[in-house]
């Protein structure tokens, strides 16, 4: 009967194996953290795109100096809108990736705690069986040819099923994670396209010193320029000064903010943007957006946006209400609403 031999040497080998696996796990964790940090750096670049709105508006204004065709201006604005949508998509993808990384780190942390509590165990019965097999192999090696001896020497100890190997590289797991990311991206894009195709009713007021209220139906993905074009078509028959005007001569004022033409209604809806006197993501109309008891408490109500000629604004921008209007800045936050 075989006897158990080499307990000290086996313990030393087990200790070396544990140290080696711990070192591999630490290297893998460092690689994961490095990849996550690189993704954060890339995502931080995406956060800066909103600060370029003023530069974009300035570029559009400079490009319309002189004789510039409406088609050229539309092409530039459509290109800016597409770029905006790409940036939003990248930002959402990064959020999903960060969430997955946080979950993965939490799982690794829990597994690490379990490993510290539970000691590495070896099945002594399997060791005895291995020794019995080795004794039989030594006897049979004397009779076996050299080729058979080489094959037997290649035989290694079996893997311990109780040891956690989740921290080791796994191609199948990585492919599954990539597949999950792609499914999330496609699902998010499909959801956004569905939102953009939804129809909304826009209430606006043509302002020439007094208000003339109208309503038009648009899709959430339409730009402010497309909205002004449709509004202009409905107003031309009633206002002679608009019959020769183009969409580039109109301004859209929402909650005392001058909204650039290249923005879409979708931009304000998904970001829950706010203006000086109410939310920018609601386009129906109520009498007031402030509670009588507390002017700082916001309600989901808004004022009708104003459509004005740029020439009228230049002549009357020192007079109320035009004196309150200012260009929209996505970086500026309006924590409370006021009336002067």
From Swiss-Prot:
InterPro entries xref list: FAM50A/XAP5_C, XAP5
Compartments, record wording: Nucleus
Organism domain of life: Eukaryota
Biased composition (Basic and acidic residues): 169-178
Gene Ontology cellular component terms for the protein in this record: nucleus
Region named Disordered: 1-22, 123-178
Pfam families in the record: XAP5
Compositionally biased intervals (Acidic residues): 124-146
Keywords, comma-separated and alphabetical: mRNA processing, mRNA splicing, Nucleus
Principal place of residence: nucleus
Summary of the function given for this chain in its UniProt record: Probably involved in the regulation of pre-mRNA splicing.
Protein name, entry field: Protein FAM50A-A
Species whose genome carries this gene: Xenopus laevis
């Amino acid at each position: 009967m075989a006897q158990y031999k080499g307990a000290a040497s086996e313990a030393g080998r087990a200790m070396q194996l544990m140290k080696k696996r711990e070192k591999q796990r630490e290297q893998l964790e460092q690689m994961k953290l490095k990849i996550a940090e690189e993704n954060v750096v890339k995502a931080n670049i995406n956060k800066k795109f909103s600060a370029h709105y003023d530069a974009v508006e300035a570029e559009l204004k400079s490009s319309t100096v002189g004789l510039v065709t409406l088609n050229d201006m539309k092409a530039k604005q459509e290109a800016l809108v597409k770029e905006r949508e790409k940036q939003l998509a990248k930002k959402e993808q990064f959020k999903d990736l960060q969430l997955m990384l946080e979950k993965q780190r939490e799982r690794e942390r829990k597994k690490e705690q379990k490993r510290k509590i539970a000691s590495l165990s070896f099945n002594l019965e399997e060791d005895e069986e291995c020794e019995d097999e080795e004794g039989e192999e030594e006897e049979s090696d004397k009779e076996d040819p050299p080729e058979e001896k080489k094959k037997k020497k290649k035989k290694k100890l079996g893997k311990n099923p109780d040891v956690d190997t989740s921290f080791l590289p796994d191609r199948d797991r990585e492919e599954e994670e990539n597949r999950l990311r792609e499914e999330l991206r496609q699902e998010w894009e499909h959801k956004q396209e569905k939102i953009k195709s939804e129809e909304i009713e826009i209430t606006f007021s043509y302002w020439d010193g007094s208000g003339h209220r109208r309503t038009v139906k648009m899709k959430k993905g339409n730009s402010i320029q497309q909205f002004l074009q449709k509004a202009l078509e409905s107003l031309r028959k009633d206002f002679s000064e608009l019959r020769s005007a183009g969409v580039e001569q109109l301004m859209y004022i929402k909650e005392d903010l001058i909204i650039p033409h290249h923005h879409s209604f979708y931009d304000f809806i998904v970001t829950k943007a706010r203006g000086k006197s109410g939310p920018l993501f609601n386009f129906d109309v109520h009498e007031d957006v402030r509670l009588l008891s507390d002017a700082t408490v916001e309600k989901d109500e808004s004022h009708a946006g104003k459509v004005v000629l740029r020439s009228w604004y230049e002549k009357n921008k020192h007079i109320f209400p035009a004196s309150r209007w200012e260009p929209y800045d996505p970086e500026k936050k309006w924590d409370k609403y006021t009336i002067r």
